[in-house]
């Protein structure tokens, strides 16, 4: 074969390979587009919508009534109302709409959803102290009955125990680690009921945890220690997910293809979400508490 013939053959082979590659890509592209187009981007869970509507409406009504009946403290209540609105909006964005739809198909989106609930919405709700506003929204007889119930020793004692620094830390940590065991996580993906239980345990555990850190009874030193150790163990779980050589959750294997990822790449992204942005949330809160503590000590020193 002449040199010119060899070059012509090589060019033909390259063209054929390119044609085959393009054909293969085009063959998979419609499948990916069809899979993405088939997603219900606005899934509706009636019970979630009902809870969001009820809690939001009661809080708004309660805040309006508080402002009508009290001449002082409006600035404090305004800050709490803004905190509640922020927590409510983050919860709604996490549980209703595209993020919830994506979380069923991408582990990384699932991690964004979980961290939004645990690291953003939960502390905002704790800062909002919504029980007072909800009580104002209820008929007076009901609010008094609820007040008597929650002040009973049989209720207050367990509450003081579970919101203690160590107990709340353990509940939050156990919920996080246990639900990321592959068999547990896969069970949540396979069952709507178990999935709801997973979200409830994450959210309730986070509320207890953040109450121990931001609540009225908090000790600044204990709160900073809790935040630091939580940042360490959540970063460890995130690192395990991000650096693992194998995918932990096989259910996602066929679901991530439509988004140009394989299951391991998706898991690595999810691990990074838990490792870095969520960890930054704990660090930022710890620094804020430390700064407030130092300012208080400085004021006490000047007063002395």
What feature does the model see in each segment?
Residues 9-12:
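Transit-peptide-like, low-complexity N-terminal presequences
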Residues 2-5, 23-304:
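Alpha-helical membrane segments of multi-pass proteins
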Residues 19-20:
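Alpha-helical transmembrane segments in inner-membrane proteins
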Residues 14-15, 25:
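Cleavable N-terminal signal peptides
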């Amino acid at each position: 074969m002449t040199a010119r013939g060899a070059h012509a053959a090589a060019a033909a082979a390259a063209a054929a390979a390119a044609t085959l590659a393009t054909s293969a890509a085009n063959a998979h592209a419609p499948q990916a587009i069809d899979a993405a187009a088939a997603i219900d981007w606005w899934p509706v869970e009636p019970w979630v919508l009902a809870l969001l509507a009820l809690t939001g409406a009661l809080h708004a009504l309660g805040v309006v009534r508080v402002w009508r009946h009290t001449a002082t403290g409006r600035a404090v209540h305004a800050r709490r109302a803004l905190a509640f609105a922020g927590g409510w909006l983050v919860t709604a964005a996490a549980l209703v709409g595209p993020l919830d739809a994506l979380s069923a198909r991408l582990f990384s989106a699932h991690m964004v959803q979980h961290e939004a609930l645990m690291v953003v919405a939960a502390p905002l709700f704790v800062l909002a102290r919504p029980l007072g506003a909800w009580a104002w929204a209820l008929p007076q007889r009901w609010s008094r009955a609820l007040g008597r119930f929650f002040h009973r020793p049989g209720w207050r004692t367990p509450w003081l125990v579970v919101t203690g620094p160590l107990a709340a830390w353990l509940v939050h940590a156990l919920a996080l680690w246990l639900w990321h065991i592959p068999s547990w996580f896969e069970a949540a993906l396979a069952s709507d009921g178990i999935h709801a239980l997973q979200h409830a345990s994450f959210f309730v555990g986070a509320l207890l945890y953040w109450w121990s850190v931001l609540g009225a009874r908090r000790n600044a030193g204990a709160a900073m220690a809790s935040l630091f150790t939580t940042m360490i163990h959540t970063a460890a779980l995130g690192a395990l997910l991000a650096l693992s050589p194998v995918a932990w959750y096989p259910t996602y294997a066929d679901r991530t293809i439509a988004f140009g990822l394989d299951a391991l790449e998706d898991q690595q992204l999810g691990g990074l979400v838990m490792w870095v942005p969520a960890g930054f949330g704990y660090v930022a809160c710890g620094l804020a508490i430390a700064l407030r503590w130092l300012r208080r000590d400085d004021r006490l020193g000047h007063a002395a």
